[in-house]
Amino acid sequence: MKTAFITGITGQDGYYLSKLLLEKGYIVHGTIRRSSSINTSRIDDLISEFQPQEKLILHYSDLLDSASIFNLINYIQPDEIYNLAAQSHVSVSFQNPIFTTQTGTLGSLSILEAIRRSNKEIKFYQASSSEMFGGAAKVKLNEQSILDPKSPYAVSKVFAHHMTKVYRDSYSLFSTNGILFNHESPHRGETFVTRKITKAVGRIYHGLQKKLTLGNLNASRDWGFAGDYTEAMWMMLQQKSPDDFVIATGETHTVEEFAQHAFSYVGLDYKKYIQTDKKYFRPNEVDYLLGDYEKAQKLLGWRPKTTFLQLVEMMVESDLNNAKREEILFNEGLLSPTWENPS
């Protein structure tokens, strides 16, 4: 029976990855940060099912506490480590560049150093990001493409990406980078543009919201389903030798296209409900990202299973159900409607 250690287990990717590993018979350990409120809502169903069997074990820890990370890894002695923890909002990284950079750089380095000192047989996955490329040219990006980060978040990811390669080359660690392009799901955070759109569709459809304000509608992204992408993470650590892989769909769509499909799914014209505001534009906008997953397909046997339209519809369906529950509470006088998305 294999053991996995996941940082960022309470996030979108943490949910899908831990679900996958638990279904494969793994014992899964995950880190959560101490706070005044418990934030495990995404994985509550997994906790209910697997924690009583001691197959899902959560630990309080902070990636910036290198001693704590070393002690935890040395105690667990996992077969695989997946580093998913990060301050992952690009726009927030401009507002909090120091915290974003510390988490993204020192966190990954603490884990790599713990593996080097504790057990070099542990396999390590680092969550790299397509934001590292910068989106300067409208071309398909692969593992050899030039990195040109445009945000503090992207810069921190470049550091972790290169450090993962340094430890692989210098200490013969099984350390891999998964360069994941944008991946979404019903579990996506509500401040990300895709989820902001689908949540608004559900609320507008049920009469709880009137307008949706967005930023750059022309920004193009290669959007895939998070469940497909976390399967690729696992596949990377099952190979005979470590390597880096781009995980993407190979097609790109604009924010406007996403909104159009989301609203049309419920029979609405998006142009009647969407407005733009400059305050939602990023200081150094990445306009275009498109990935080439040929290497992953050839060496891992991986390819995306979920189409763009299936992804949009899946997210809208989920948020329609969420809005329906919210409507019931509103009708019972337990909630007030929000006529526009919160800023």
Model-based region annotation:
Residues 1-183, 237, 265, 306, ...:
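N-terminal Rossmann-like NAD(P)+-binding domain of SDR-like oxidoreductases, especially those catalyzing
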Residues 23, 30-31, 38, 61-64, ...:
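C-terminal substrate-binding subdomain of Rossmann-fold SDR/epimerase-dehydratase oxidoreductases
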